[in-house]
A protein has these predicted regions:
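Extended, folded cores of ATP/NTP-driven motor/assembly subunits in large transport
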Residues: 1-319
Length: 319
């Protein structure tokens, strides 16, 4: 009698639908690309070269980065973006920009659909200009495009924050040796108030952005301040094309996630909104009974699209 095959987790199913490619840009620099049909996503890492950046060095730039992202929407190949800032229990902070492109031009655009080799080449050619713009708004921080291995390691740690230090040590001494199939969690447990993934448990919230807001009215400094017992905090701003704004990218909403080491730590994670203003707390909604899909939408992979994962209802209502 053959053993039963365990059913795929939602994370395994979502990531299995994405192909991880390796390409070089116009300067011969390796670039990792996540491909899903005609959609391609590039990740750009923002770090402090000294490794000691405090959270405010990133949160203070959110407005500038948001304006830069909105301008990228004028390129008719760009379909969406995400901007994630995260902090770890040890106080380290970093940011990831996810940019998604499509081989299908927007309706009315004077372009033809591109095949994969053409699309990959076009993205690689445009990356230099894109990176220059981001570097101009990130003075003092290191900006670089993620390789395929960077993406693997990033996703592996996102699902198990407890191994973050081990992954950093391995990367500094020859590499982790992980592959794309190692990235998804092997275990998931979903409840109304939390989502368990490998050895971590997360709680997520969403907030929609109104048409007259540059950014959601969230105090990002207090949301992301490192806290004992909270392995990782992440706030991900999601951007989508807004035809009413002359096809620029516009803030669509934010997903906030706190990771702890087990179910006993969930009350600690759930206290995250307590330092926000009353009006902000009223708009920041717990992802009740949708913790797994909301966690995925908040990863720095620009996954919050209807064909990738179930878009949290709070955000879908503003689309």
């Amino acid at each position: 009698m053959s053993p039963k095959k365990l059913p795929e987790t939602i994370a395994q199913r979502t990531l299995r639908g994405m192909e991880l490619l390796t390409q070089t840009d116009a300067y011969g620099v390796e670039v990792g690309l996540l491909a899903t049909g005609k959609r391609y996503t590039v990740l750009i890492s923002i770090h402090d070269p000294a490794g000691s950046a405090v959270t405010t060095r990133f949160t203070a730039r959110l407005g500038v980065w948001s304006q830069w992202l909105q301008g990228l929407g004028l390129d008719d190949r760009v379909t969406g973006a995400s901007l994630s800032v995260q902090t770890r229990e040890n106080g380290s902070s970093s940011a990831i920009v996810g940019l998604s492109f499509t081989a299908r031009p927007r309706p009315g655009a004077d372009r033809k659909p591109l095949q994969r080799p053409q699309m990959v080449e076009e993205i690689s050619t445009h990356l230099a200009r894109i990176l220059d713009g981001l570097r101009e708004s990130s003075a003092g921080l290191m900006v670089r495009v993620c390789t395929a291995q960077d993406i693997v390691d990033l996703v592996r740690v996102a699902f198990d924050s407890s191994i973050a230090a081990d992954v950093e040590t391995a990367r500094a001494s020859g590499g982790t040796g992980l592959s794309w199939t190692d990235a998804p969690p092997r275990h998931e447990a979903t409840a109304a108030a939390f989502y368990g993934h490998d050895r971590a448990v997360s709680t997520s919230w969403t907030m929609a952005t109104r048409a007259d807001e540059e950014l959601p009215p969230l105090d990002f400094d207090t949301v992301l301040v490192p806290a004992p017992g909270v392995l990782c905090k992440r706030a991900t701003l999601i951007y989508r094309i807004a035809p009413a704004l002359e096809a620029t990218l516009a803030p669509f909403g934010v997903v906030v996630t706190a990771d702890v080491g087990g179910a006993n730590g969930v009350p600690m994670a759930q206290a995250l909104p307590s330092r926000q203003s009353l009006r902000t707390r009223l708009r920041l909604r717990a992802a009740t009974s949708a913790q797994d899909t909301t966690f995925l939408a908040g990863l720095p992979l620009d996954l919050a699209t209807p064909h990738m994962v179930m878009v949290p209802r709070e955000l879908k209502e503003t689309a």
